[in-house]
Amino acid sequence: MIERGKFRSLTLINWNGFFARTFDLDELVTTLSGGNGAGKSTTMAAFVTALIPDLTLLHFRNTTEAGATSGSRDKGLHGKLKAGVCYSMLDTINSRHQRVVVGVRLQQVAGRDRKVDIKPFAIQGLPMSVQPTQLVTETLNERQARVLPLNELKDKLEAMEGVQFKQFNSITDYHSLMFELGIIARRLRSASDRSKFYRLIEASLYGGISSAITRSLRDYLLPENSGVRKAFQDMEAALRENRMTLEAIRVTQSDRDLFKHLISEATNYVAADYMRHANERRVHLDKALEFRRELHTSRQQLAAEQYKHVDMARELAEHNGAEGDLEADYQAASDHLNLVQTALRQQEKIERYEADLDELQIRLEEQNEVVAEAIERQEENEARAEAAELEVDELKSQLADYQQALDVQQTRAIQYNQAIAALNRAKELCHLPDLTADSAAEWLETFQAKELEATEKMLSLEQKMSMAQTAHSQFEQAYQLVVAINGPLARNEAWDVARELLREGVDQRHLAEQVQPLRMRLSELEQRLREQQEAERLLADFCKRQGKNFDIDELEALHQELEARIASLSDSVSNAREERMALRQEQEQLQSRIQSLMQRAPVWLAAQNSLNQLSEQCGEEFTSSQDVTEFLQQLLEREREAIVERDEVGARKNAVDEEIERLSQPGGSEDQRLNALAERFGGVLLSEIYDDVSLEDAPYFSALYGPSRHAIVVPDLSQVTEHLEGLTDCPEDLYLIEGDPQSFDDSVFSVDELEKAVVVKIADRQWRYSRFPEVPLFGRAARESRIESLHAEREVLSERFATLSFDVQKTQRLHQAFSRFIGSHLAVAFESDPEAEIRQLNSRRVELERALSNHENDNQQQRIQFEQAKEGVTALNRILPRLNLLADDSLADRVDEIRERLDEAQEAARFVQQFGNQLAKLEPIVSVLQSDPEQFEQLKEDYAYSQQMQRDARQQAFALTEVVQRRAHFSYSDSAEMLSGNSDLNEKLRERLEQAEAERTRAREALRGHAAQLNQYNQVLASLKSSYDTKKELLNDLQRELQDIGVRADSGAEERARIRRDELHAQLSNNRSRRNQLEKALTFCEAEMDNLTRKLRKLERDYFEMREQVVTAKAGWCAVMRMVKDNGVERRLHRRELAYLSADDLRSMSDKALGALRLAVADNEHLRDVLRMSEDPKRPERKIQFFVAVYQHLRERIRQDIIRTDDPVEAIEQMEIELSRLTEELTSREQKLAISSRSVANIIRKTIQREQNRIRMLNQGLQNVSFGQVNSVRLNVNVRETHAMLLDVLSEQHEQHQDLFNSNRLTFSEALAKLYQRLNPQIDMGQRTPQTIGEELLDYRNYLEMEVEVNRGSDGWLRAESGALSTGEAIGTGMSILVMVVQSWEDESRRLRGKDISPCRLLFLDEAARLDARSIATLFELCERLQMQLIIAAPENISPEKGTTYKLVRKVFQNTEHVHVVGLRGFAPQLPETLPGSDEAPSQAS
């Protein structure tokens, strides 16, 4: 019998009132008695703290705080301690008689939070003689002691031999040791377990029915059934793992795709950049060489352009100098042309004005004669009109006087007076003082004759004056002509000058006639002179271009030489063109061939890569397509053999899997129908009863029962008979054995044991001999052993099957690779290397390019010589026709001579043109200049005097006529005579008056008409004079302007001036054109020089940069190559087919791969950082580092147990094979792992039945418990209706819900939860997931409802609730429940700890005064029956009869508080006995 462990003592060190106190604990009940505040609760608190040192759970509330949700701030612990180090220790002895001291070191933490620091520890191997107080205290003197800190305690214990001290950093480790050593009943793995344990202790401490426990009775009482649960969990874990593995395989397949994608993109990213750098390095080297060649060529071109620039600049300076002279000459010629044109226009105006003046002169002379005649007639009309007027006046006067005389008597006297007046007037006018009326008639005749004589004399003088006036006019005309030609001179010199001018005019006219021939001659000579100058210029230009001076005689020979050179150069150029065409044609053919080879090279390289991969994979060398096809046939044969062997291993593996599955059935049943029959018959499988048989006994029992080892044990065979009728769903042989499954033994058979065999006497006449099986399968241990061996065999078979599958798939993939190679690359794989041919063609192309370059240089020189020769011949062709002009040295002198003669002729022509008309006019009248008509003025005066005399004579004749006419008046002597005479006179006067008035009117009309006509004549004369004077002035101005112009205006002058101007303009234009050409050429040359200079600088800069870049890149490239070779990735990166792509294509390829890689490594921080660093274009080695990092990353993810290679590419290929094999294997495994819903229902039902039986056993132990009116206590266990329905559906109607259990998307737990929801739609599942609900449904405890019932008085069995019971009854019932929980925990934990350990049992009860004596006695009885220790606290009036009682009294002495303790042990039948350690504890150390 295993002894139960016991708590020996409780030690409090430095607690409030207890400095160093050890309470020895009774084996059953220890009672703490004392008044209020005596320290009972403090003692219990120290015990609980040492038992559960978890500050998150500890809460020591006062009784008055019962039901409160919060207590004091320190939860009752801080105030129970003293300052300094405190201890609470439990001294125990377990079933192995091992003394174990467990405890805690407590210490108050300074601060307002009133915290406590707890350190748990344990002491093993302590001698029984050593008391706990001796360990933790050090005696200073008789009255003082000191508490040791934990480190000193550790040192002290380590110094003791055989003593082990353990300090724990976690409560879990502390409780784990206490469980292993049998101090606590249950393993407290988690905070939840600790909380349950604390709630149990707390419930016992404060008494009553704890709602926290009764609500969770299933968690406290029912074991977790970890085996079944673990089976379910293992099954689900296996399924989950299987599915996760399948999902992982799918993920891995996607990872494989990712890996392939990562390797592909990384290879593209790095290889493209690697090959681009390789290409760029080659290109940079070529560019550096090209830059160097271009630099040399540019320097030569710049030197040539500089020489050319100097020549053109010199020629431009010459043309600029010549242009100034030509511009001056052209401007002078233009001005001369303008002057000639102006002179011609002036000459035309002069001639026009001279013609107009001649015409005006004639008209003016004619008009002068008309005006003179008109003046004479006007004077005559005026005289006639005046005479008629005088006569009329006279007659009127006479008639008036006569009328007056007739009116008055004095009329005669008046007439007489008038006659006397007329006589006196006549005397006065005629100067005849002796004139009388009688002599008047005689004198009238005299004076009339005198008048006639005066008139005749006047007419004669008038005729003479007209003639003199004409002579005077011719002389003035001739004189004016001489003055106009020669200038002012004396009148007497006019004759001589006129004759000289006429002779000079003849000479000038002769010279003027030579102007046109001289002009033509001069024009011809000037043209020849210009041609001579042009020929000299061409010769000078030719000599300058040829760089040598030539004589005129050498030009013809030079012309022939140049023509011969042109012919030879033309042939050379033609031959060079044909040779160049041949070279270029060959070059194009080479280029075309290289292009075709470059297009074929990537295909050939891809074929070679594929061929090399095939060679590496199969380890064969292929030299022809026939080798490939032959090896493919061998590969097919090998594949068939591997498939046959794989199928054989697979069949054996399936057989092993089936056997493992059969042996893995719960209860050892190999037939699922037996489980259903056992449940139906209410029995138990025999294999399940003997499930715990050891491996050593398994062969015996297997042979003992023989074929009946699969029998069903039933309580009563008679009750099974009715079930056997019509039974068909069962094995062929069904064995039924009657017996109690709870106490079944093998006594039903008579057995004789032999060597490795048994003889079973079934009946008197029937024995059975059975040998011990070599591989027993009876009992769980035997099955597990067999399953283990089968698993080992299965592992070997699986590994072999995996190897064969891998080989088959590898062979198949190799076959596919060969098929792809034959379909894609076989046609080109064994052709010649295009790259070698490309290299040969490139070398030939370089030779052709060099030959073409040399040929171009030679051809360029020949072309330059040809062009120079052509230019020379062209220039000579223009010069040779003018050789005679170049030899004529006197041409310029002749031109000057003719020009002088032409100037003289032109001067004469101008003289003739200017004075020719005057000389022509002067010539016929020159003779009038011999005598000067100076008497013209005297004649003019005589004529005027004659006119006056004629006028006076007329007046005298008129006066005498009047006297004669009034002669009658003188005879009036008296009035009679006057009257008689007056009548006749009146008539006569009137007649004469009428005649005189008529004459006067006629005279007036004639005078008026002649006056108007004279006025018109005068106006015409004035107009003509004005026009003549104006034109004369204009003519003089024009002649002066013509003289000022100083140009001879003739008919050919304008033409010559225009020709000269046009020639100069043509020369100027040619010069300007040439100058513009030179300027443009010079500008172009300068631009070309600038471009060449910039190009030269750029080429120098580019060359040095490129050279530096090449040098720098060489170092970087060496580092890259070293890194590539060190890491062995050159084969992956040096992809020759990429060498045929352009840099842009490679960069695009690299950039696309970079974008894909950024997405691919987004979740990998290391690769992401390395990729980001590799993006630096200046550090190509970082891309290699990234590639190496990718390979390393993939290598780390290669399972070396599956894939035996370091190459990720090969690993991916092997991974594809392995993943496909694993997918098949795991799919079949999932089908085998899946458990049926009927099996689940059977397992849960059996577990429920077993636990119901266990609860019934526990109830038997509580039947005799009574407290007050409570006669008995029991636990009632029922299956929930909803869960019972679920079990029925799982076992009977599971086919209807296969959509849940056959779903690959749902685990079994999730399918179970979905089914539960489907069956109970009215139940709200809350926020719980189907997985959580399913896991709860797999726990049988959730199928049960548990409640505590009490048999109380007359009420019978009713539910145990605090409201229905008294305080004592509730405390007793609660204590009974706690005892049941503790017992259940022990049963549950028995298989977890050693078989030789029975754990301690201890509960608490504070304030036990609420129980009566009968109830306390019941507690004592319960503790005795269950071997349980109990610590109760009660007031002083409680005196238990059994156990140990401590009386506690708190005292204060000299401001020091301590508890006085007295211990008593059992006083009823025995004498009181003072327990050890009951003396007062020493005072605290000062």
Curated annotation (Swiss-Prot):
Superkingdom of source: Bacteria
Alphabetically ordered keywords of this record: ATP-binding, Cell cycle, Cell division, Chromosome partition, Coiled coil, Cytoplasm, DNA condensation, DNA-binding, Nucleotide-binding
Positions of ATP binding: 34-41
Location, primary (coarse class): cytoplasm
Name under which the protein is recorded: Chromosome partition protein MukB
Membership in a protein family: Belongs to the SMC family. MukB subfamily.
Domain comment, as recorded: The hinge domain, which separates the large intramolecular coiled coil regions, allows the homodimerization, forming a V-shaped homodimer.
Disulfide bonds, paired cysteine numbers: none
Gene Ontology biological-process entries: cell division; chromosome condensation; chromosome segregation; DNA replication
Coiled coil ranges: 326-418, 444-480, 509-603, 835-923, 977-1115, 1209-1266
Region ranges (Flexible hinge): 666-783
GO annotation, cellular component aspect: cytoplasm; nucleoid
Gene3D superfamilies: 1.10.287.1490, 1.20.58.850, 3.40.1140.10, Immunoglobulin FC, subunit C (1.20.5.420), MukB, hinge domain (3.30.70.3500)
Any one GO molecular-function label of the UniProt entry: ATP binding
Subunit structure: Homodimerization via its hinge domain. Binds to DNA via its C-terminal region. Interacts, and probably forms a ternary complex, with MukE and MukF via its C-terminal region. The complex formation is stimulated by calcium or magnesium. Interacts with tubulin-related protein FtsZ.
InterPro entries hit by this protein: MukB, MukB/SMC, MukB_hinge, MukB_hinge_sf, MukB_N_dom, P-loop_NTPase
SUPFAM superfamilies: P-loop containing nucleoside triphosphate hydrolases
Purpose of the protein: Plays a central role in chromosome condensation, segregation and cell cycle progression. Functions as a homodimer, which is essential for chromosome partition. Involved in negative DNA supercoiling in vivo, and by this means organize and compact chromosomes. May achieve or facilitate chromosome segregation by condensation DNA from both sides of a centrally located replisome during cell division.
Gene name of the encoded protein: mukB
Cellular location(s): Cytoplasm, Nucleoid
